[in-house]
Amino acid sequence: MSPAEMNSVVNSVFIAPEAGDVIKGSGGLRKARVALAGRGKSGGARVIYWYRNEGFPVVLLWAFSKNETENITKSQLAILVKYSETLQRDFRRRK
């Protein structure tokens, strides 16, 4: 994914963080499809991110082009879930 494409992915998520689908069994992580120039949504990027509500920031965890990989593995998801649990704990302490 080029830097310009990554910028497009980041902007899409930050504009509408609730648009992504919640990933089953992830504790609330979201996955969104983002269209890339000339590829459309089905051939575009996927982004996995952490977002709770307006009181928390959006944290981009992983972005990838569909042509790079179709989806993440269960073990990769488990790592992201552990990280998201740490994020939630840390942000709650700050409030």
Question: How would you label these PLM feature ranges?
Answer:
Residues M1-K31:
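N-terminal first-folded block
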Residues P3-M6, S42, L77:
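Amphipathic alpha-helical transducer elements in NTP-driven molecular machines
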Residues A19-F64, E68:
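Basic/aromatic recognition patch in beta-strand/loop cores that engages polyanionic ligands
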Residues Y51-K95:
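Enriched for short, Lys/Arg-rich terminal
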